[in-house]
């Protein structure tokens, strides 16, 4: 069993974006391929959780396993994706990454995993005053908590955090750049992110 593994969440419907965000172009590749490469600098074991409709296309872009949600919990949001990844790869800790934060740096995963401590169930950054539970790390014991929530048809990350012993980490305290955590939810945000990229 490895100590650390990565789970990339690419199973959302991207309704506000209008097309699958995982396959949006970024730095001459796709969001999902870019994020897997960034994670791969720090983590050897990575799995991508994909929506059924795009799984075959995602597989063309990444050199890591691409799976769907556990059938019983398919479509139950990020909790289903996280627990599906935990079932696929055995590890002590899992770094979670959504496919729509393309600015993330490999430095973040080094910082995040350095903060893990078995006293805690989760390590969650707080960036500009906001919790970022999808750019966080979770201990494998959280798997049972997720199953219990899904059994009760509870799907929110907040409900999971309320049941965990969480180590909250201020981005400023660990020299994390707030830009790493920017989400791209709409085409307008995508255009702005592309502009910011070309201005770097």
Curated annotation (Swiss-Prot):
Binding residues annotated for Mg(2+), in chain numbering: 100
InterPro entries: MobA-like_NTP_Trfase (IPR025877), Molybde_CF_guanTrfase (IPR013482), Nucleotide-diphossugar_trans (IPR029044)
One Gene Ontology term, aspect cellular component: cytoplasm
Record EC number: 2.7.7.77
Molecular functions per Gene Ontology: GTP binding; metal ion binding; molybdenum cofactor guanylyltransferase activity; nucleotidyltransferase activity
Binding positions (GTP): 9-11, 21, 69, 100
Enzymatic class: transferase
Compartments reported by the entry: Cytoplasm
Cofactor(s), names only, from the UniProt record: Mg(2+)
Keyword Cell division set for record: no
UniProtKB keywords: Cytoplasm, GTP-binding, Magnesium, Metal-binding, Molybdenum cofactor biosynthesis, Nucleotide-binding, Transferase
Biological processes, Gene Ontology terms: Mo-molybdopterin cofactor biosynthetic process
Gene3D superfamilies named in the record: Spore Coat Polysaccharide Biosynthesis Protein SpsA, Chain A
Catalyzed chemical reaction(s): Mo-molybdopterin + GTP + H(+) = Mo-molybdopterin guanine dinucleotide + diphosphate
Function statement: Transfers a GMP moiety from GTP to Mo-molybdopterin (Mo-MPT) cofactor (Moco or molybdenum cofactor) to form Mo-molybdopterin guanine dinucleotide (Mo-MGD) cofactor.
Family: Belongs to the MobA family.
Domain notes: The N-terminal domain determines nucleotide recognition and specific binding, while the C-terminal domain determines the specific binding to the target protein.
Name used for this protein in its record: Probable molybdenum cofactor guanylyltransferase
Organism: Bacillus cereus (strain ATCC 14579 / DSM 31 / CCUG 7414 / JCM 2152 / NBRC 15305 / NCIMB 9373 / NCTC 2599 / NRRL B-3711)
């Amino acid at each position: 069993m490895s100590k650390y593994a990565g789970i990339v969440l690419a199973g959302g419907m991207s309704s506000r974006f209008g097309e699958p965000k995982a396959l949006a172009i970024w730095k001459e590749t796709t969001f999902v391929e870019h994020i897997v490469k960034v994670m791969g600098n720090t983590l050897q074991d990575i799995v991508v959780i994909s929506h059924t409709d795009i799984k075959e296309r995602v597989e063309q872009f990444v050199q890591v396993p691409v799976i769907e949600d556990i059938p019983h919990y398919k479509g139950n949001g990020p909790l289903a994706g996280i627990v599906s990844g935990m079932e696929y790869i055995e590890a002590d800790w899992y770094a979670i990454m959504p496919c729509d934060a393309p600015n993330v740096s490999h430095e973040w995963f080094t910082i995040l995993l350095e903060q893990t401590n078995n006293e805690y169930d989760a390590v969650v950054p707080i960036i500009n005053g906001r919790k970022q539970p999808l750019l966080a790390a979770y201990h494998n014991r959280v798997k049972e908590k997720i199953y219990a929530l899904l059994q009760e048809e509870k799907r929110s990350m907040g409900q999971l955090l309320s049941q965990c012993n969480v180590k909250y980490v201020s981005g400023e305290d660990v020299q994390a750049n707030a830009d790493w955590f920017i989400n791209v939810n709409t085409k307008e945000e995508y255009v702005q992110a592309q502009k910011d990229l070309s201005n770097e």
